[in-house]
């Protein structure tokens, strides 16, 4: 029901923006949004499959630029990205949606967790809808399978199963993983035969 109401509000607001007199839209400039919304939830699908979902306290739509900017007021913006490899659920202070390409950019205190349990932290993260891949040029911390890696810049599958850090990479095995590995090692025997 909520999704239907949000969709109806979105369509109504788009029609209202289209019906505004041309002179009023011309004077707005690029810094004034064509629409403002609160309690924002948007789902993008392609051929019946979800590409992403975005939830936010507030959103502004800039039709001429073809972007929607979602921001937090009290709760972080939540974005779930879907691909054949799996899904990634993330939180950030802001998200920008390119309404033409359907790409999503997350900015400010970005944290994300993938289905298999991998996670990341960074300042900004881009998701390409066409490639269904993640990208960043910012410093990043990636935790995957008991390994903590830090670096600058990353390219990864949506589920973080395959990730490549680009520069200043440092990795360490997390202590709980070291303990697990030690338990799995065979116990050395003393003496002969």
Model regions: which residues?
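Mature-chain termini and adjacent capping regions
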Residues: 1-193
């Amino acid at each position: 029901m909520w999704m239907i109401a949000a969709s109806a509000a979105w369509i109504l607001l788009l029609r209202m923006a289209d019906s505004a007199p041309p002179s009023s839209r011309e004077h707005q400039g690029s810094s004034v949004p064509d629409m403002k919304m609160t309690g924002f939830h948007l789902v993008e699908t392609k051929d019946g499959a979800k590409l992403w979902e975005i939830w936010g306290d507030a959103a502004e739509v800039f039709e001429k630029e073809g972007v929607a900017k979602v921001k937090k007021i009290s709760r972080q913006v939540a974005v779930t990205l879907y691909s054949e490899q799996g899904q990634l659920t993330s939180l950030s202070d802001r998200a920008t949606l390119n309404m033409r390409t359907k790409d999503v950019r997350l900015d400010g205190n970005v944290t994300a967790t993938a289905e298999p349990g991998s996670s990341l932290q960074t300042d900004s993260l881009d998701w390409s809808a066409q490639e269904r891949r993640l990208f960043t040029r910012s410093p990043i911390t990636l935790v995957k399978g008991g390994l903590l890696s830090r670096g600058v810049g990353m390219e990864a599958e949506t589920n973080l199963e395959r990730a490549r850090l680009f520069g200043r990479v440092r990795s360490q095995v997390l202590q709980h993983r070291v303990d697990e590995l030690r338990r799995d090692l065979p116990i050395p025997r003393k003496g002969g035969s």
